[in-house]
């Protein structure tokens, strides 16, 4: 009996060891995959003249590469945070469909739980350590009096970073004492990892969720405009070839006018220079006299050239408009019939469907919170994968939840970068500097870390937030969750109503103004 028990214990230990090794291998493969995709994205946006500028300075090249690598890692963590809920929901449905399959034995609760814990850990490291350190490291020059090199810059960066960390941690301790989470004591730093750092991440997640409250409803509206710009709209009662020919002829006419004005300006300049050389009379050293008719002639040409300059500006503006319209028509001409007839309407219908379902789920979640049927998003029970489906519609409902989560992420990003204060920070292809990359990676990390919280708060899914994500204190506040649902649903409905009724309201306002003017004119005529 003792030998059998020892063999069972040994088998359990071996199984636990193999499971741990397998999970770490899966995590490593996921990190490599996410890092590779993030590297492609960051390389697409970064400005390459920085490498050429410091190609002869090895220290600057090393600093730039380290900063670039950590920015890429931060974006990879952001992608992982955005994928947490979809991967967890899909894993639960796969285990329900194939509970005894040999090929999904590696997919278990321990793997998903570890994935959430790793993403939470790397999110904290990237947000509070890597990004601040990278920014300070890229801007550092070393203390005064030290030689140039990497080590003096590391010393300066570490010193400034430690001072900033002390300030932030002291403020966090004060805020936690103000909100009643823990009393401020002399040895408050002993509870740094268990109380203050989770509270700091809770504050950051709250700011991220509030930012998504502003960006997501606006993104619902802006996404329709983005699809309208990217996809080719159907041609209803339009002869595109005839319009293209008309725009092409008008563009050629504008170009001829610009060439004629430029030739006329050159001839005027040559005539003025020739007249000055042939007709000027010297009246002494340093003074030149021009006859009166020549002065009048030059002034007349000056006025004429000013008028022509305004004409040139108008013609250039019109030429740019014609060029953009001609490109749009050319895209219409070269697009296929299937793309014009089916893709654009299907995309619009899909956006309308996702938006309508999101609003209905928010309304349902709000009513269930008021009645008391729905529990708060704070995780309170033990997690187990593959026991029951999270949706009443089964795999179809789970797939719909995954699509809605991705839709929320897309709308929040589109709405965030459509804000007026983000126009200068918005990344551009091959034109984004390293500080802008750091800032955008930080924003993406905050938004993606808040995406699971947003999806759980507004009732998109019933999947519990795992790990430390579900232990955020303010998720258990009924007033905050209910108010968030009310504001989110109301704001989204108002933004969509404003989007789809703007043309009708504008036309109605114009008609009312026109009728008012006619009525006032009629009254004044009678009087």
Curated annotation (Swiss-Prot):
> GO molecular function: any one?
transmembrane signaling receptor activity
- Topology relative to the membrane: Multi-pass membrane protein
Q: What is its main location?
A: membrane
Q: Does the keyword Nucleotide-binding apply?
A: no
**Description of the deletion phenotype:** Larval lethal. Conditional knockdown in the ovary results in progressive loss of undifferentiated germline stem cells.
**TM segment ranges:** 23-43, 66-86, 118-138, 161-181, 195-215, 342-362, 396-416, 434-454, 469-489
Q: Could you tell me which residue ranges are on the Extracellular side of the membrane?
A: 1-22, 87-117, 182-194, 363-395, 455-468
Top-rank taxon, per record:
Eukaryota
User: Which residue ranges are assigned to the Cytoplasmic compartment in the record's topology?
Assistant: 44-65, 139-160, 216-341, 417-433, 490-527
GO terms classed as biological process:
female germ-line stem cell population maintenance; oogenesis; positive regulation of BMP signaling pathway; signal transduction
Q: Which UniProt keywords apply?
A: Cell membrane, Differentiation, Membrane, Oogenesis, Transmembrane, Transmembrane helix
Q: Where does the entry say this protein is expressed, by tissue?
A: In the ovary, detected in germline stem cells and their progeny. Also detected in the somatic follicular epithelium.
From the Swiss-Prot or TrEMBL record, state where the protein is found. Answer: Cell membrane
Q: Cross-referenced PANTHER family, in alphabetical order?
A: LIPOCALIN-1 INTERACTING MEMBRANE RECEPTOR LIMR, PROTEIN LILIPOD
What family does the database annotate?
Answer: Belongs to the LIMR family.
What's this chain's function?
Required during oogenesis to promote self-renewal of germline stem cells, probably by enhancing BMP signaling activity.
- This one is known as Protein Lilipod
């Amino acid at each position: 009996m003792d030998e059998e028990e020892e063999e069972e214990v040994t088998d359990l230990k071996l199984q636990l060891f193999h499971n741990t090794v397998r999970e770490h291998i899966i995590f490593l493969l996921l990190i490599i995959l996410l890092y590779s995709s993030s590297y492609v994205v960051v390389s697409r946006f970064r400005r390459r003249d920085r490498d050429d500028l410091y190609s002869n300075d090895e220290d600057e090249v090393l600093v730039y590469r380290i900063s670039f690598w950590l920015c890429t890692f931060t974006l990879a963590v952001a992608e992982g945070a955005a994928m947490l809920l979809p991967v967890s929901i899909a894993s639960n449905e796969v285990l329900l469909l194939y509970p005894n399959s040999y090929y999904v034995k590696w997919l278990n609760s321990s793997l998903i739980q570890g994935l959430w814990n790793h993403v939470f850990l790397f999110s904290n490291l990237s947000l509070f350590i890597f990004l601040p350190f990278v920014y300070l490291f890229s801007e550092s020059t070393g203390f005064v009096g030290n030689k140039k090199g990497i080590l003096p810059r590391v010393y300066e960066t570490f010193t400034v970073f430690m001072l900033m960390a002390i300030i932030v941690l002291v403020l966090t301790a004060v805020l936690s004492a103000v909100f009643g989470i823990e009393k401020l004591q002399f040895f408050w730093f002993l509870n740094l990892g268990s109380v203050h750092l989770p509270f700091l991440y809770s504050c950051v997640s709250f700011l991220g969720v509030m930012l998504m409250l502003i960006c997501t409803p606006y993104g619902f509206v802006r996404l329709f405009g983005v699809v309208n710009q990217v996809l080719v709209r159907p041609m209803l009662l339009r002869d595109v070839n005839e319009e293209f020919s008309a725009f092409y002829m008008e563009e050629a006419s504008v170009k001829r006018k610009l060439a004629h004005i430029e030739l006329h300006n050159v001839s005027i300049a040559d005539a003025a220079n020739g007249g000055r050389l042939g007709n000027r009379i010297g009246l002494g050293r340093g003074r030149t006299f021009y006859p009166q008719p020549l002065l009048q002639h030059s002034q007349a040409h000056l006025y004429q050239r000013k008028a022509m300059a305004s004409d040139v500006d108008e013609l250039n503006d019109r030429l740019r408009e014609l060029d953009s319209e001609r490109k749009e028509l050319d895209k219409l001409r070269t697009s296929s019939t299937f793309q014009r007839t089916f893709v654009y309407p299907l995309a619009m219908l899909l956006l309308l469907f996702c938006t309508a379902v999101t609003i209905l789920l928010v309304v349902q979640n709000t009513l269930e919170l008021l009645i008391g049927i729905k529990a708060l998003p704070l995780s309170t029970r033990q997690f187990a994968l593959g026991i029951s489906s999270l949706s009443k519609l089964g795999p179809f409902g789970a797939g719909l939840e995954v699509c809605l989560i991705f839709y929320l992420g897309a709308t929040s990003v589109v709405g965030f970068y459509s804000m007026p204060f983000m126009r200068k920070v918005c990344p551009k292809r091959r034109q984004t500097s390293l500080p802008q990359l750091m800032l955008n990676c930080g924003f993406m990390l905050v938004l993606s870390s808040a995406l699971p919280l947003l999806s759980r708060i507004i009732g998109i899914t019933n999947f519990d937030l795992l790990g430390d994500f579900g232990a955020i204190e303010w998720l258990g506040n009924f007033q905050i969750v209910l108010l968030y649902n009310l504001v989110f649903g109301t704001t989204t409905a108002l933004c969509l109503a404003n989007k789809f009724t703007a043309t009708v309201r504008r036309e109605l306002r114009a008609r009312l103004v026109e009728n008012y003017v006619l009525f006032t004119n009629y009254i004044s005529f009678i009087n």
